[in-house]
Amino acid sequence: MAAQVLSGHEAAEAVYEEIRARLRSLSFTPSLRVIRLGEDPASVAYVRLKDKRARALGYRSQVEVYPEDLPEEALLERIAALNADEEVDGILVQLPLPPHIRTQRVLEAIHPLKDVDGFHPLNVGRLWSGGKGLFPCTPLGVVRLLKHYGVDLRGKEVVVVGRSNIVGKPLAGLLLREDATVTLAHSKTQDLPQVTRRAQVLVVAVGRPHLVRKEWVREGAIVVDVGVNRVEGRLLGDVHPEVAEVASALTPVPGGVGPMTVAMLMGNTLEAALLRRHGASG
């Protein structure tokens, strides 16, 4: 039996419907400010997509573009001004940044309540301590995608391959909050295929095209492919298509986790607006 396709587009649309419903009850319009340095084609495309989606929801969205050689201090000064601007609810600095800019310093400069990417150390701490905050969009999207398709994570053995600060680590924290039993595997994990075969839910986020083969996957497992790798003009995931022969459900690349990342950014922007005004989501 062919694996069920877990469409990120379908799940994202459900998120947008919820956002639109919540917006109708509010007396204000959320505001998002995106900062981009340089003209990297991927960054240009991602920022355009985020801005387009924000505007489609009725958010006040503005993109600020600066030259790639903008000094770090100038960027930090601009972030400080946006932190102080009561008209701005969410701030996003598009990554990656040029080599002369210290990314961690920039991420820590964004006010935690405006940190719609969820990368500020305070939000990271709140994630792991069970508190309320703004959390990274891709991990949020993975969990929301699974919930959309009725996957109950409580007690499930979930293996996450990849330990990045953007996906793997925060996803492990979110899965623990859902009462999953989580294994965080990585490049130094011994006998990785043996570890992945234990998973009832397998999430792969390593940036290595078609790394995971069907022999790595338990019969009937649910597989989420976070990888996006451009190879000879094509977008390939971290999971080989043959995995569909053994998995019960599988996310496509593209069209799986990607749309969910943007949807959760829109959700975080609304949450940021509510947290700043009321201290809780409404």
Curated annotation (Swiss-Prot):
Gene Ontology terms describing biological process: L-histidine biosynthetic process; methionine biosynthetic process; purine nucleotide biosynthetic process; tetrahydrofolate interconversion
Coiled coil: none
Secretion signal, residue range per the UniProt entry: none
Molecular functions per Gene Ontology: methenyltetrahydrofolate cyclohydrolase activity; methylenetetrahydrofolate dehydrogenase (NADP+) activity
Enzyme Commission code(s) on record: 1.5.1.5, 3.5.4.9
One Gene Ontology CC term in the entry: cytosol
Reactions accelerated catalytically: (6R)-5,10-methylene-5,6,7,8-tetrahydrofolate + NADP(+) = (6R)-5,10-methenyltetrahydrofolate + NADPH; (6R)-5,10-methenyltetrahydrofolate + H2O = (6R)-10-formyltetrahydrofolate + H(+)
Binding positions for NADP(+) per the UniProt entry: 162-164, 187, 228
Alphabetically ordered keywords of this record: Amino-acid biosynthesis, Histidine biosynthesis, Hydrolase, Methionine biosynthesis, Multifunctional enzyme, NADP, One-carbon metabolism, Oxidoreductase, Purine biosynthesis
Pfam entry (one): THF_DHG_CYH
Similarity annotation: Belongs to the tetrahydrofolate dehydrogenase/cyclohydrolase family.
Protein name according to UniProt: Bifunctional protein FolD
Organism: Thermus thermophilus (strain ATCC BAA-163 / DSM 7039 / HB27)
Lineage: Bacteria, Thermotogati, Deinococcota, Deinococci, Thermales
Underlying gene: folD
